[in-house]
């Protein structure tokens, strides 16, 4: 079976929450990550812009050897995935369906909250995915446009971030949700703040782990090796290459806060300018 190389992309550092799950669920897998930091945030971009970004990034990832693509961005998953599957032969998976399935599984009351970018909320993909799984579940959606810029500027755990989180979550609290989908891969950077605001009675769903588990099963069905045990006694490692369309230094600084170390190597590439 082919070992394969996984390509992931997001508007910025948020997709690193998915890379982290790849390192656990797909040990030893070669990974190429593209952060489109020149165009972050994606939530206020038009459909045409999002399709253009996705097409160029996926083409680049494939040129670098990726033969399986994980959309590490909810906005692109909601807007671009279906069309990109038509344009490329490489298999792809997005965050929406696995995240919706996890929320339906965990919700006891069927009252599911969603915070996401404006584009993801407008696309309605999570509501459709949840309804397809269980028509008795309701999705209460809230766009949270200020959160991605806060994460990208390294302000995840600040009073400014907590004020914004409280503002966005209050309408969902009033709806009596028992489960909240973190509908943007940047939002796990804010997990501690969100948990403080909502308390333990609301379960948080990060679609990243469910998506990578689904990717692993899909790879096995397609004849890929889902991991790389290597030679006997060889420790599993994840081979990572990072590319960004904006500042490599800015990406390293914010990513280092999340990873506990600065990612290397990070290469700036003028792919989308």
Swiss-Prot record:
Keywords: Cell shape, Cell wall biogenesis/degradation, Isomerase, Peptidoglycan synthesis. PROSITE patterns: ASP_GLU_RACEMASE_2. InterPro entries: Asp/Glu/hydantoin_racemase, Asp/Glu_race, Asp/Glu_racemase_AS_2, Glu_race. It holds the Pfam family Asp_Glu_race. It catalyses: L-glutamate = D-glutamate. Its EC number is 5.1.1.3. One of its GO terms (biological process) is peptidoglycan biosynthetic process. Substrate binds at residues 10-11, 42-43, 74-75, 185-186. GO terms for molecular function: glutamate racemase activity. The active site is at residues 73, 184. Pathway: Cell wall biogenesis; peptidoglycan biosynthesis. It is an enzyme of class 5 (isomerase). Provides the (R)-glutamate required for cell wall biosynthesis. NCBIfam families: glut_race. Belongs to the aspartate/glutamate racemases family. This is Glutamate racemase. It comes from Desulforudis audaxviator (strain MP104C). The gene is murI.
